[in-house]
Regions:
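Membrane-interface amphipathic segments in extracytoplasmic regions
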Residues: 1-185
Length: 185
């Protein structure tokens, strides 16, 4: 039986670790493995020019409001120099890259907090985080159970925002809202 060849574009904070774990244990699919973690599609295309068109590509996108709360708690979990003991979410939103993401080795502001549309192109199939199991089953044409890994523990994302921070995130990620049909709050 031929394995289906896949390229997974791992946008940060969109269940990528769970996806990779799923494919490590599935013999029906061949995931292109020479990729760096969180590599955007234009690099993948450039570095795999001979194989690129032989693979089915996909990425997962997430509601930007939810993704940013998840990023905040991820950075908080890293406990960067006790930074998060002093900065509240709505304060951090004003300029998140001015703060912790510059302090993490190997993690830049363009990675963790970059708009999702920058990771993909028109050749990439988009699955939504909010309906991931269902969309993944449809995309793979196979019933799979996605493991939950790296989940941050926090309240519903809307509990963290005020009107000003909702507006900041909408304008910062406006293209993601439009391209992936997420609603402005």
């Amino acid at each position: 039986m031929n394995k289906e060849k896949l390229i997974f574009i791992h946008i940060p904070k969109t269940a990528g670790t769970s996806i990779k774990k799923l494919f490590l244990n599935d013999n029906d699919f061949s995931l292109l493995t020479n990729l760096k973690k969180h590599e955007p599609i234009y690099n993948i295309k450039k570095n795999n020019i001979n194989d690129y068109n032989k693979y089915k590509k996909f990425a997962i996108v997430r509601n930007p409001y939810d993704r940013i709360v998840s990023s905040y708690f991820f950075l908080q979990k890293m406990n960067i120099k006790n930074f998060f003991q002093t900065i509240e979410f709505n304060e951090w939103i004003k300029n998140p890259c001015k703060h912790p993401c510059k302090l993490l080795p190997g993690l830049t502001k363009y990675l963790l907090l970059a708009p999702q549309y920058l990771w993909i192109d028109e050749t990439v199939n988009i699955l939504k985080y909010e309906n991931l199991n269902k969309e993944l089953n449809t995309f793979l044409n196979k019933k799979v159970n996605l493991p939950k890994i790296n989940n941050s523990i926090h309240e519903h994302y809307l509990n963290y925002y005020n009107n000003k921070s909702l507006n900041i995130i909408y304008h910062r990620y406006k293209e993601d809202f439009k391209k992936f049909n997420y609603k402005k709050l």
